[in-house]
């Protein structure tokens, strides 16, 4: 029996989400992760709804914060948006913000964890493109 009463606040240090759209999407994303069979303890930093530092849809910053621009995210189908959120949650869970490297290895590792959690990362990548090194990543982590 799946538990639908998941208190997502227990998984985050701090949450600043204003829009109902992002609240619902985060709830669905966390619920899917919790029920994926993933056996490690889930622990994430802060979630901030608003503009990202580098101007993209979502990012994890050095200070253990996931920033999401819900206005941009809202342009994607729900399964793509959830895969994108899961990808950023994977970066945070794996603590990639502590050991950022100027290559794409962590992008592939985050994709694989999001895939393990049951998200359609392949559709996300088909729609948004393969991971690539770009100025946004360099700006966030410099």
Task: Mark where each language-model region is.
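C-terminal end-helix/capping segment
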Residues: 24-35, 62, 68, 105, ...
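Active-site scaffold of zinc-dependent metalloenzymes
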Residues: 45-77, 89-92
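Short alpha-helical catalytic segment bearing the HExxH-like zincin motif
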Residues: 80-88
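Catalytic Zn2+-binding segment of zinc metalloproteases
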Residues: 74-75, 88-109, 116-122
């Amino acid at each position: 029996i799946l538990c639908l009463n998941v208190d997502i606040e227990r998984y985050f240090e701090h949450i600043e989400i204003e829009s109902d759209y992002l609240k619902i999407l985060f709830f669905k994303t966390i619920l899917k992760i919790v029920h994926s069979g993933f056996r490690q303890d889930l622990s994430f930093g802060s979630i901030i709804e608003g503009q990202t530092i580098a101007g993209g849809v979502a990012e994890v910053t050095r200070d253990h914060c996931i920033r999401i621009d819900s206005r941009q995210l809202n342009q994607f189908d729900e399964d793509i948006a959830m895969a994108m959120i899961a990808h950023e949650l994977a970066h945070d869970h794996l603590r990639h913000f502590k050991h950022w490297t100027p290559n794409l290895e962590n992008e592939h590792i985050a994709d694989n964890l999001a895939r393990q959690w049951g998200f359609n990362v392949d559709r996300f990548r088909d729609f948004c493109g393969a991971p690539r090194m770009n100025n946004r990543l360099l700006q966030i982590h410099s």
